[in-house]
């Protein structure tokens, strides 16, 4: 039987990163990831849309808002270091009717309170950013929302784990 100091259940992006942080903090420890799929990251992490969220959907001062904003920065830095392409596509949030304008206002306020760069745009500006999108009167543009290939990201993070001796 094999013995490990730490065993992580689940080899998705979170599990791999938890294993890496444990190994970095306890360098002499043995760390193992147990994954039900044949390879790490083959379940949800490898099949998601790869969105790097900006952090304006969450309430001010919430842990989710902090992690989202900090994670956006950290993931961008990691991708830059590893030469992983980031698709700087931005994101638009539109309103279908007058009632949904109130929801846009809530998101704008959350973004402001969370120190997230959001731009209120009109219908003409929206058509310049995304010609196929339609909105009622105005919309929100989030320039710091982006996407990254989940498979390339997982592959790179797995390589980091391998280099640290994680099993």
State where each predicted segment sits.
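Gly/Ala-rich phosphate-binding loop of Rossmann-like dinucleotide-binding domains
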Residues: 19, 23, 160
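Glycine-rich FAD pyrophosphate-binding loop
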Residues: 23-47
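Short amphipathic alpha-helical/adjacent loop interface patches that line ligand
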Residues: 37, 72-75, 161
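Helical element adjacent to the flavin cofactor pocket in flavoenzyme catalytic cores
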Residues: 140-167
